[in-house]
A protein has these predicted regions:
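ABC ATP-binding cassette signature C-motif
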Residues: 1-190
């Protein structure tokens, strides 16, 4: 029944603790649960465990006491304090990573369309696969270019062709945030 009670929450932590050498408790006996749509802030002085808490929630740090359980199939988006970006990429290429599922679906759809022309094509299998990828595109919004432009403008991103290597720390963080938002996570950790 405990599993049933947890199902109404999008995320639950039960008696979570984190110890780092030499036996320093960063988090101790933390229990919390979030309902869908909750907006929660975590406040504390430097070194009090805020970033550690977010890493645990994101599933990045699994070496903990207790349990941290997201709702099944929940997509968690996490923006670390120092986002890791490929310095050789452009701003556009980095932001497009947030839409990789859609771009992948579009590419696979093109392959499916071409496969219909093959003499031994399995139309039933192709039609089923086509429906799956068309559904991904339909639910994510067909106009990815417009989504990217709106997000880039809202976050005041540098020009698309700018290299990540030449960006300031704040610009890199905004590019990483744009990529994360476009991936449309169910839970966002900033």
């Amino acid at each position: 029944t405990r599993q049933k009670a947890m199902a109404q929450y999008v995320f639950t932590m039960n008696r979570v603790g984190k110890i780092v050498p030499p036996k320093r408790h960063i988090l101790k006996d933390v229990s919390l649960s979030f309902f869908p749509g909750a907006k929660i802030g975590v406040l504390g002085i430097n070194g009090s465990g805020k970033s550690t808490l977010l890493k645990i929630m994101a599933g990045v740090d699994k070496e903990i006491e207790g349990e941290a359980v997201p709702m099944p199939n929940m997509r968690i988006g996490f923006l670390p304090q120092e986002p890791q970006l490929d310095a050789a990429q452009t701003v556009r290429a980095t932001v497009e990573e947030g839409l990789s599922e859609i771009f992948g679906a579009k590419a696979r759809l093109d392959e499916i369309y071409a496969a219909y022309a093959e003499p031994d094509a399995d139309f039933d299998r192709l039609a089923a696969e086509q429906a799956k990828y068309e559904a991904i595109i339909a639910t994510s919004g067909a106009d990815t270019e417009l989504q990217m432009e709106i997000a880039a403008d809202a976050l005041r991103l540098p020009p698309w062709e700018a290299k990540v290597a030449n960006l300031s720390g704040g610009e890199k963080r905004r590019v990483a945030l744009c990529r994360l938002l476009l991936s449309k996570p169910d839970m966002l950790l900033l």
